[in-house]
């Protein structure tokens, strides 16, 4: 055990003192300097919104499809990149960026359209990698072949929104696919040597500390290259915000009697 602890301490030194390899550390090691993400909008939708699986999206998802800080969708991909770089470069002298397609489901479109926008992003001289946020059930063979093709040009990362391994919670948040679909997607991506980053949410309603740890233990055994640990973020106007304010009925809907109150900023200041 002492040897193991010593090994862990030595590893922390190589990770700048942290007990894990952070994204910032990995990017510096890989690209030789600080790298930022520029968040892009490919103008896509989601099967959980267009009626294929549902119309209201995941319970926590905003109207912006979790891409509220993405660039203006009316701009071309190149223009989006330039506008994002202009915003970021005013703060720090960053030279290298990752093109991150975040809003909605970014493989939920015809393959030729995906090829066009992804290649446009990757052709920018200051873009060093492509990161694509998507769903495991939107990775068909043609899409996988395209991603494999692009991965030979510059690194391609796929960010999958798993959130939890527990089916009961997945149904509550309206994730819209079974856990086995996630497993298959990871396997398919790794066969093509495409790196996978998994998004999880800590603090989902009804989940215990042990259930959260079960999700982490499961992912520790998977062939994935990164994990994003997100604290539950309740956005105004989402179904999650509504359901946390109101008591759930037996059929899973929300009662009209509020069980909590939101304190507005002005009210909070009056309490100080």
Where are the regions a protein language model picked out?
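Distinct, well-ordered alpha-helical segments
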Residues: 111-119, 140-149, 210-212
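Catalytic cores of alpha/beta
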Residues: 205-220
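Short linear proline/tyrosine/threonine-rich motifs used for host-factor recruitment
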Residues: 260-262, 268-270
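Short beta-strand/loop segments at the ligand-binding rim of alpha/beta enzyme cores
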Residues: 192-200
């Amino acid at each position: 055990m002492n040897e193991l602890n010593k090994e862990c301490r030595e590893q922390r030194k190589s990770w700048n003192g942290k007990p894990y390899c952070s994204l910032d550390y990995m990017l510096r090691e890989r690209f030789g300097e600080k790298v930022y993400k520029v968040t892009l909008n490919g103008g896509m939708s989601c099967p959980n919104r267009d009626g294929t699986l549902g119309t209201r999206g995941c319970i926590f998802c905003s109207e912006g499809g979790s891409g509220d800080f993405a660039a203006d969708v009316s701009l071309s991909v190149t223009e989006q990149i330039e506008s994002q770089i202009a915003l970021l470069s005013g703060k720090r002298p960053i030279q290298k960026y990752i093109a991150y397609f975040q809003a909605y489901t970014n493989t939920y479109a015809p393959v030729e359209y995906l090829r066009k926008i992804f290649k446009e992003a990757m052709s920018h001289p200051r873009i060093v990698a492509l990161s694509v946020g998507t769903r495991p059930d939107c990775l068909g063979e043609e899409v996988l072949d395209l991603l494999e093709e692009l991965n030979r040009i510059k690194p391609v990362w796929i960010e999958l929104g798993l959130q939890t391994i527990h089916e009961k919670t997945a149904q509550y948040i309206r994730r819209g696919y079974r856990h086995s679909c996630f497993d298959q997607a990871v396997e398919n991506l790794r066969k093509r040597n495409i790196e996978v980053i998994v998004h999880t949410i800590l603090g989902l309603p009804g989940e215990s500390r042990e259930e959260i740890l079960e999700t982490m233990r499961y992912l520790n055994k998977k062939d994935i290259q990164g994990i994003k640990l997100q604290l539950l973020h309740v956005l105004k106007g989402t179904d999650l915000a509504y359901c946390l304010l109101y008591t759930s009925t037996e059929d899973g809907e929300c009662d009209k009697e509020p069980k909590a109150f939101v304190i507005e900023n002005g009210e909070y200041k009056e309490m100080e």
